[in-house]
Amino acid sequence: MKFVLLFGVLLVTLFSYSSAEMLDDFDQADEDELLSLIEKEEARKDCIPKHYECTSNKHGCCRGHLFKYKCQCTTVVTQSGEETERCFCGTPPHHKAAELVVGFGKKIFG
């Protein structure tokens, strides 16, 4: 009888210890995931939205539905006759085509 009682107490102790460690691991994973999401959100706030100027920061465009927007540049002639480069964040044609195909695929297959 003493052996069964001792074995039961040992089993309950081991079970509570292992479940506490698993909960600590889950809590740590949740904290890491939360920090990762916060960092991504901060990066998203600093990015340049679609159709906005990105001349000074060509790699700072935000993400679109599937792809990150690309900084597209054109040469503009000012009224004084100077040529300057102006850039904006936009979706390249091959990304537009891929998004169109994915959209049709979602409509067909559900």
Swiss-Prot record:
Subcellular location: Secreted
Disulphide bond pairs: C47-C62, C54-C71, C61-C89, C73-C87
Signal peptide: 1-20
InterPro entries in UniProt: Spider_toxin_CSTX_knottin, Spider_toxin_CSTX_Knottin_CS
UniProt note on tissues of expression: Expressed by the venom gland.
Gene Ontology molecular-function annotations: toxin activity
Primary site of residence: secreted
Cellular component, GO, one term: extracellular region
Residue ranges listed under propeptide: 21-44
Keywords: Disulfide bond, Knottin, Secreted, Signal, Toxin
Pfam families associated with the record: Toxin_35
Protein family: Belongs to the neurotoxin 19 (CSTX) family. 03 subfamily.
Domain notes: The presence of a 'disulfide through disulfide knot' structurally defines this protein as a knottin.
Protein name: U1-lycotoxin-Ls1hh
